[in-house]
């Protein structure tokens, strides 16, 4: 997923699929990245928030905070899961 330079990244586990606006992969957290337990502030310079693997409580907290300070940006949610095949094969029998 491409992340804008004016975005805030809030994560529970760091994803392996983030790229910045120039196309480089963001390997480790940087100065615009926070965990859900850390404190952060939203201001007008931040245009969007990317939430990575949030819990339902984390989503609710961010939504309440956004509404309370009247921040007018976008919120994107990224869920990463391991691709586990089903325990059976799908077969098209004729």
Curated annotation (Swiss-Prot):
Lineage: Viruses, Varidnaviria, Bamfordvirae, Nucleocytoviricota, Pokkesviricetes
Family affiliation: Belongs to the orthopoxvirus OPG142 family.
GN (gene name): OPG142
InterPro entries assigned: A15 (IPR008445)
Subcellular location: Host cytoplasm; Virion
Signal peptide: none
Protein name (record): Core protein OPG142
GO molecular function: ATP binding; DNA binding; helicase activity; hydrolase activity
Top-level lineage group: Viruses
Annotated GO CC locations: host cell cytoplasm; virion component
Function (record text): Late protein which is a part of a large complex required for early virion morphogenesis. This complex participates in the formation of virosomes and the incorporation of virosomal contents into nascent immature virions. Required for the stability and kinase activity of OPG054.
Keyword annotations from UniProtKB, A to Z: ATP-binding, DNA-binding, Helicase, Host cytoplasm, Hydrolase, Late protein, Nucleotide-binding, Phosphoprotein, Transcription, Transcription regulation, Transcription termination, Virion
GO biological process: DNA-templated transcription termination
Quaternary data: Part of a complex composed of the kinase OPG054, OPG092, OPG100, OPG114, OPG115, OPG142 and OPG157.
Keyword Phosphoprotein in annotation: yes
Originating species: Monkeypox virus
Keyword Chaperone tagged: no
């Amino acid at each position: 997923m491409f992340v804008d330079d004016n975005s805030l990244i809030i994560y529970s586990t760091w994803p392996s699929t983030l790229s910045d606006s120039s196309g480089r992969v963001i390997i480790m957290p940087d100065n615009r990245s926070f965990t859900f337990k850390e404190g952060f502030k939203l201001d007008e310079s931040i245009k969007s928030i990317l939430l990575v693997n949030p819990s339902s409580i984390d989503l609710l907290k961010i939504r309440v905070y956004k509404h309370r300070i009247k921040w007018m940006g976008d919120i994107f949610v990224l869920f990463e899961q391991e691709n586990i095949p089903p325990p059976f094969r799908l077969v098209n029998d004729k």
